[in-house]
Amino acid sequence: MRLMTKLGFRALVASCLIAAGGAANAQVNVLITGVGSTQFPIATANFANEAGLPQQVTSIVRADLARSGKFTNIDAGSTPVPETASVDLGAWKAKGANAFVAGSVNREANGQYKVNFILYDTVKQQSLGGLSLTATDTTLRTAGHKIADYIYQKLLGVRGVFATRLSYVIKTGNRYQLQISDSDGQNARIALSSTEPIISPAWSPSGTKVAYVSFERKKPIVYIHDLPTGRRYMVSDQKGNNSAPAWSPDSNTLAVALSLTGNTQIYTVNANGGGLRRLTQSSSIDTEPYYSPDGRWIYFTSDRGGAPQIYRMPAQGESAGAAQRVTFTGSYNTSPRISPDGKLLAYISRTGGGFKLYVQDLQTGAANAITNTNRDESPSFAANGQYLLYATQSGGRNVLAAVPSDGSAPPQILSVQGGSVREPSWGPFMQ
């Protein structure tokens, strides 16, 4: 959630209804608006035996690769090619494909599916291996995402994030929904439904829980939602505002922003709700905490210098070391997020009357805007650090967008028909 003047929070009240596991009618749709400058040409043949199945694995793989902006899908024709087939790799190279994928989906006696595939390097004329996955009617999409992840890693040397999940808040009419979806916005499920706003969802490192802020008791309270069970529990209901939850890397602790004593300050609380501890001791407003991946530091937003900027302090708090200012490009910077490798800081900077997503190299201090939008908020790194998800406006509507973290390509816009979408958080790698 973007900070407003003096970092005050929006005046929100909510009354919430748990709807765990419900299918979402309004799903996020991905519109590809730009691709990377360097694309890997690949041909993915139709998988054998998938006609008539609930999900077409081949289509999911192709769509994932195209959406990444890193691949060009070469026409592989309509003839299915199983992984057991003899493949003329030279012929596929002649068609412009530097890699070729063959596979099959076979239904087993127990009703499950066995999904097999092989990835070939047509340039070196060799196999790059493959996987044998077990799936059900409801997990065929996941199998497709895992295949795309395998291809991405084998050909680009970086782990793919197609099998990760997103969380975000959709508003349709007067109803708000906290939704959990696949990385492509499909297979969306409702975690929480409300007649009023829901804010600040944050994934646990395990990907099984989401912390968020609810206003159902006429004040902001931090909850944790257990996704496998659909249950939730209260974590912080202190006097005043309870906001901006952020998980520690070991999942044991949440950093939160509380106005317990007046000005909003940074605290930590155990994930079970106990062990409250104050970390900042300033007379200013300190908010939006975020842990470094190694757990040593907490980055946060503070106006202690007169205007909002990003600072860093030891995870034990200012008693263990003074907070140090991190951002110096721009006079108004908020919403810190650290890349999974700890090398980059993403944040929102007020620029020319708008708000833009910036990325800063934490070693050199160099910072650059990476978007062509100007109402940006709520950045979130993909688990591999190669992309950022954020909220913005497009065509007068609140939408999400995904952009390479190096700014090498324009954003992909993610929107929902008939509604607005905000408060994104990109989930971790799934085990």
From Swiss-Prot:
GO terms for cellular component: periplasmic space. It comes from the Bacteria. GO terms for biological process: cell division; protein import. The Tol-Pal system is composed of five core proteins: the inner membrane proteins TolA, TolQ and TolR, the periplasmic protein TolB and the outer membrane protein Pal. They form a network linking the inner and outer membranes and the peptidoglycan layer. Its main location: periplasm. InterPro entries: 6-blade_b-propeller_TolB-like (IPR011042), PD40 (IPR011659), Tol-Pal_TolB (IPR014167), TolB_N (IPR007195). The keyword Signal applies. Pfam families: PD40, TolB_N. Residues 411-431 are annotated as: Disordered. It is found in: Periplasm. Residues 1-26 form the signal peptide. This is Tol-Pal system protein TolB. Part of the Tol-Pal system, which plays a role in outer membrane invagination during cell division and is important for maintaining outer membrane integrity. The lineage of its organism: Bacteria, Pseudomonadati, Pseudomonadota, Betaproteobacteria, Burkholderiales. It comes from Burkholderia ambifaria (strain MC40-6). Gene3D superfamilies: TolB, C-terminal domain, TolB, N-terminal domain. Belongs to the TolB family. Keywords: Cell cycle, Cell division, Periplasm, Signal. NCBIfam families: propeller_TolB (TIGR02800).
